[in-house]
């Protein structure tokens, strides 16, 4: 494995983001996800002879917003080009994209890893249409669903500044958050609205020349991106060290095996025979157009992070966790209007809400009731065990936690004399556990705590109980 450490990976990412428009990029067909196959098509998106595309203005506006949010320079003049290739899911046999004059160029974003902050350059952001979808079926073979043909995309191309799987994941998560806050896409990975192509090469450390790169297509999760990078890095190093040669090719990442497999030789730009689309006029933007779009972008994650840390006293870690979804950040601020125990609210989010809401943020509990729960814990009326129990119930059917604590007698036991008596009862019947603890077995202490908490139905003040138990032992 020593040879692996002699090499560094060089990574560039191409991220395809599906825009949240009601209609397609060049026609009025809807973009609803999950519709019956081939029911959202027309002569334009099917590429039939004699039709003319009309550019959806909102696609341009959304792309410019993405560029502004990622510190790009916005082009006052750009054009659209035909990218020619044959594939069954591309009815026209060309894709309308942008080649040499994209809408946005020379941007960047900052990422945070264990090694600190790093700037990752963004080469360009351009608009393009999506292709259809191949559906493989054992009975009928491969079928084509053209509903996705013409769905608007932006492609965000990074500079080859990324040097590890961790940096790649940090970049993807930061970019996704920025796009979400820009309001131009919901970035639902399971619907293909945020997917990534990974370009990777390796070179000896200290070397300035790039190696031959491979491209891994359409990976839709950060976890799989990391796995694909680690596997491909090792594969390329082992190939070079064994005297082999890296071939410039497109590879597929297999989620089940965690390996990459060759699909086809990687094309160069010349292979696509780009030329300006004669049916579409150039895209022209004025300074006023750009300023107007900039004013429509709300608070971005970095600004909001500073606010959360300064206003609510949260750590960078808690702030980042809350800011992964705009809806979650908004809900936190609603809760914060009704309590001053901000750190406790953040803990409820990271331990309970994020666990229960799964991938997309959702919380059926009123903000005021979540705030009341945080206040009950902050004022030591209930303990963490009761917080967990109550919030789980509130998630199923919302209610006022203050009333529940009073009605059900869930208040924490803080009376020291009562807690001392409980500890004495536990110790009387726990001679073996006492000896185990005194002989250095820490798990014995946990068992004693468990017995004491059990006697109080989980309502004892755990901090006070630990102190009393340790003093007694």
Annotate each PLM feature.
Residues 1-299, 310, 316, 337, ...:
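Basic, nucleic-acid-interacting segments
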Residues 12, 60, 172, 226, ...:
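Hydrophobic face of alpha-helices
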Residues 20, 199, 234, 350-358, ...:
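Amphipathic alpha-helical core segments of compact helical bundles
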Residues 76-80, 241-250, 287, 307-312, ...:
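Short coil/turn segments at secondary-structure boundaries
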Residues 314-338, 342-397:
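Amphipathic alpha-helical "recognition" segments
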Residues 361-371, 375, 381-455:
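Strongly charged, low-complexity linkers/loops
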Residues 423, 435, 467-473:
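A carboxyl-terminal module marker
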């Amino acid at each position: 494995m020593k040879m692996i450490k002699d090499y560094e990976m060089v990574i560039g990412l191409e991220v395809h983001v599906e825009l949240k428009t009601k209609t397609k990029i060049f026609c009025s067909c809807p973009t609803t996800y999950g519709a019956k196959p081939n029911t959202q098509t027309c002569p334009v998106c099917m590429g039939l002879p004699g039709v003319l595309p009309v550019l959806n203005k909102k696609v341009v506006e959304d792309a410019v917003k993405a560029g502004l949010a990622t510190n790009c320079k916005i082009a006052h003049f750009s054009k659209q080009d035909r990218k020619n290739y044959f594939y069954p899911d591309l009815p026209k046999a060309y894709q309308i994209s942008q080649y040499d004059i994209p809408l946005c160029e020379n941007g960047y974003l900052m990422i945070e890893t264990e090694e600190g902050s790093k700037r990752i350059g963004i080469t360009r952001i351009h608009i393009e249409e999506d292709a259809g979808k191949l559906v493989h079926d054992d009975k009928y073979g491969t079928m084509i669903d053209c509903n996705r043909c013409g769905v608007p995309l932006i492609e965000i191309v990074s500079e080859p500044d990324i040097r590890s799987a961790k940096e790649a994941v940090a970049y993807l998560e930061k970019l996704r958050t920025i796009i979400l806050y820009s309001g131009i896409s919901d970035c639902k990975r399971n619907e293909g609205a945020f997917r990534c192509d990974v370009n990777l090469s390796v070179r000896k450390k200290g070397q300035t020349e790039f190696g031959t790169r491979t491209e891994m297509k359409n990976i839709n999760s950060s976890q799989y991106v990391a796995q694909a990078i680690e596997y491909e890095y090792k594969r390329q190093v082992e190939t070079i060290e064994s005297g082999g040669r890296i071939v410039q090719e497109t590879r597929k990442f297999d989620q089940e095996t965690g390996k990459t497999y060759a699909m086809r030789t990687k094309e160069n730009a010349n292979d696509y025979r780009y030329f300006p689309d004669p049916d579409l006029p150039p895209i022209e933007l004025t300074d006023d157009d750009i300023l107007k779009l900039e004013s429509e972008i709300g608070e971005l994650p970095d600004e909001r992070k500073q606010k959360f840390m300064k206003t609510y006293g949260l750590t960078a870690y808690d702030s980042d966790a809350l800011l992964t979804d705009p809806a979650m950040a908004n809900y936190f601020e609603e809760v914060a209007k009704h309590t001053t125990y901000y750190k406790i609210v953040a803990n409820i989010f990271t331990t309970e809400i994020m666990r229960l809401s799964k991938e997309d943020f959702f919380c059926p509990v009123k903000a005021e009731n979540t705030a009341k729960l945080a206040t009950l814990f902050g004022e030591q009326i209930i303990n963490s065990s009761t917080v967990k129990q109550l919030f789980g119930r509130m998630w199923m059917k919302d209610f006022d936690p203050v009333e529940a604590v009073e009605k059900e007698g869930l208040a924490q036991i803080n009376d020291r004399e009562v807690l001392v008596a409980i500890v004495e009862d536990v110790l009387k019947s726990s001679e073996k556990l006492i000896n185990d603890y005194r002989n250095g077995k820490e798990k014995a202490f946990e068992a004693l705590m468990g017995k004491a908490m059990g006697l109080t139905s989980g309502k004892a003040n755990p901090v006070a109980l630990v102190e009393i138990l340790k003093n007694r032992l």
